[in-house]
Amino acid sequence: MIKSKLVSLDEAVADIADGSKVGMGGWIFNAQPMALVRALIRKGARNLDLIPTPGSIAPDMLIGAGCARSTVCVFISFEQFGLAPHFRKQAEAGTLKVYDLDGPAIAGGLRAAICDLPYMPIPDLGTDLPRHAPEFYLPLPSKPGERKMLAAAAVKPDVCLLHAQQADEYGNVQYLGSPFFDAMLAQASRKVIVSVDRIVSTETIRRNNHLTKIPSAMVDMVVEAPWGAHPSASPSLYRGDEKHLKEYVKASVSDEAFSAYLKKYARDAATQPAYLDALGGARLGTLTTSESNLT
């Protein structure tokens, strides 16, 4: 009999050791694994090496909460709200080690990990990034007139945190929007933890098998966390919460205000229902979108 992989948020992050390399799925303000991030903060995680592809509030919150020591990323952005406040603050202060890579290096590094190779060839874009992050770039020889190439070092997370719209209890994960880099990140990682807005029946998964982007064999744990990407969007289910993102940015101005923010929305909100209560149901109702896929 197939074993259920359904666990609680706290159970999902319990074995993530300090010093782990943590991949983070989604794309900026879409499908950020926020419920899992808040669980990591409650756990008191430390010295994590974050690998967002690319991220926004999820890695920034971990950085601000003192959970991270480094990032390997293309960028961490708050787009229309400015630069990611804690990422910027700690990068400028030198308390966060930042490995700044280009897109081909991240993608090539994940592909190398998937293939169990130390490197993967990528085009040389002519930037100075290889000089600043030599651990991740190896020059390759080329003849006159040939395209210059580099070898991107493997990027292999110890664990990756993803958020999708639905899955069954066995970990067959379905996306009602773009999966972004999530499937590649899952293949490259040693352990895969996925939060979903809802658990559905295996029959629903079979009936809509074209939506399955990450099969059960690749997933170690799945967590049912309604609104688990909030305040980022979960495509086809709810929009990003700009009001809350502004609240986060405002709270990030001072250590005292940010500590109060974390207390309210992460440390005191020990479960996902408690987090939703802190937000208010009326607020969430304004963010719901219409679905276009079967469930």
Where are these regions (language model features)?
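Conserved alpha/beta enzyme-core scaffold
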Residues: 1-295
